[in-house]
């Protein structure tokens, strides 16, 4: 009688372990495309990511680089004071988007150009992640009055 209880307990523990591992794997698989890593322009230039990798880049819109093309096409460079990365974006820019202001973009780095699929302009801490502030402070270009 004891061996049947012991065997049943082992089966339940094994089944629970398999279920836990399976659910963890499914959650990880589902989240893999939803996680966007943050990089500063210096990090992008030091170690360029794969063209298939979606990530976020943040910094200041470099002065004198904002060019509006036909339609909603826009080209500019984002800098952290140490490096600049050219950015292209097709879409409507946020109202507060301008040169020498903070921005965060989501997209891919292809052939030396960051192709943004989303641009957020900084107007408060909601749009300026701590990583961007830290990167700008590290480069010595962050202004406290900007936040």
Swiss-Prot record:
Function: Heme chaperone required for the biogenesis of c-type cytochromes. Transiently binds heme delivered by CcmC and transfers the heme to apo-cytochromes in a process facilitated by CcmF and CcmH.
Cytoplasmic side: 1-9
Biological source species: Ruegeria sp. (strain TM1040)
Keyword Metal-binding in record: yes
Membrane topology category: Single-pass type II membrane protein
Gene3D superfamilies the UniProt entry points to: Nucleic acid-binding proteins
PANTHER family: CYTOCHROME C-TYPE BIOGENESIS PROTEIN CCME HOMOLOG, MITOCHONDRIAL (PTHR34128:SF2)
Keyword terms: Cell inner membrane, Cell membrane, Cytochrome c-type biogenesis, Heme, Iron, Membrane, Metal-binding, Signal-anchor, Transmembrane, Transmembrane helix
Residues where heme binds: 123, 127
Protein's recorded name: Cytochrome c-type biogenesis protein CcmE
Domain of life: Bacteria
GO MF annotations, alphabetized: heme binding; metal ion binding
Cellular component GO terms held in the UniProt record: plasma membrane
A Gene Ontology biological process term: cytochrome complex assembly
Keyword Cell inner membrane listed: yes
Subcellular location: Cell inner membrane
Family to which the UniProt record says this protein belongs: Belongs to the CcmE/CycJ family.
């Amino acid at each position: 009688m004891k061996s049947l209880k012991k065997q049943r307990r082992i089966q339940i523990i094994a089944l629970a372990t398999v279920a836990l591992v399976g659910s963890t794997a499914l959650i990880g698989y589902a989240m893999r495309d939803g996680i966007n890593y943050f990089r500063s322009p210096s990090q992008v230039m030091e170690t360029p990511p794969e063209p298939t990798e979606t990530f976020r880049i943040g910094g200041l819109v470099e002065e004198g680089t904002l060019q509006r093309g036909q339609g909603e096409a826009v080209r500019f460079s984002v800098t952290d004071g140490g490096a600049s990365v050219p950015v292209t974006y097709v879409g409507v820019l946020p109202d507060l988007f301008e040169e020498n202001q903070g921005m965060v973009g989501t997209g891919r780095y292809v052939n030396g150009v960051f192709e943004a699929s989303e641009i957020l302009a900084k107007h408060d801490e909601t749009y300026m992640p701590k990583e961007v502030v830290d990167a700008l402070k590290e480069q010595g270009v962050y202004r406290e009055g900007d936040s």
